[in-house]
């Protein structure tokens, strides 16, 4: 595909938006999925104040703005703000005219039908896209790992899903959703650090804790054993320098926060951990394909980036599964962006080019066309 007609691939996550061109091996733009509006009108006189800010700009001006996340738990809940994010993606980040490029968007598993239609409508009517496609995030992650069958554990900032996929098709009856993800772990780490006497209260400080989480946290293979080790020596302690120069020490918080993925009770949630949820998802599938699923458990999303998570997952899932089963956890190093990468691969396949939903088809059939063309 020549560069001028390269398709655009946009993966809209609850926390970050990833965007770029089909055929590239990584997204060109990665920015927070936030829209900020000034708290007080006319405070910044002469600043040429805008009525809204998106992404990094909203993040850097957050002191004077009210921030909103238009995507909650993976699902778009505020379409006006979502439109602003897409506008920002096309015109400010990628600097392209959307009417000149096919657009591939991603959606959460179990996204309501009305939502897919709304997405389709906005792309064709507001942005005049020549062609459009919407793909399920977890399916793209599986493609990115070079598979068409497997179960994807996709955990981002706002939501976690287990999605069994057979021969390229997600099995909706067996998809499970867990409302526990990166944002909750950051909150939990804030709580743990409070107990140590380090208060983090503002949204700015919350970003610092997210950074601590990403740099220092890991998943213990044996939680109780790790707690004992941490209590008996300072071997597991690490220090972190705050922006103001203060240095804080963090010990068992390093593995206590991510442990909530396996023990949601830590957060007061009556949910199954990610290992049990994966097992339950597999159990809802046909007996004949379970072996293929156990042997292809693919991790995807930023919240699966903790060191030690694959080994722990291997251990827990093996303990739950029938003894004859071979469990294999696949943790690609680029899994933070594997949804986007899968989209880039799909949209640049020559065999995919006749699967796009065109503007003409949309004009003839309306938004419902998306259910017939994209599945």
Curated annotation (Swiss-Prot):
It comes from the Eukaryota. One of its GO terms (molecular function) is hydrolase activity. Disulfide bonds: none annotated. It holds the Pfam family Actin. Its main location: cytoplasm. Its EC number is 3.6.4.-. It is found in: Cytoplasm, Cytoskeleton. CDD domains: ASKHA_NBD_actin. Actins are highly conserved proteins that are involved in various types of cell motility and are ubiquitously expressed in all eukaryotic cells. Belongs to the actin family. This is Actin-1.
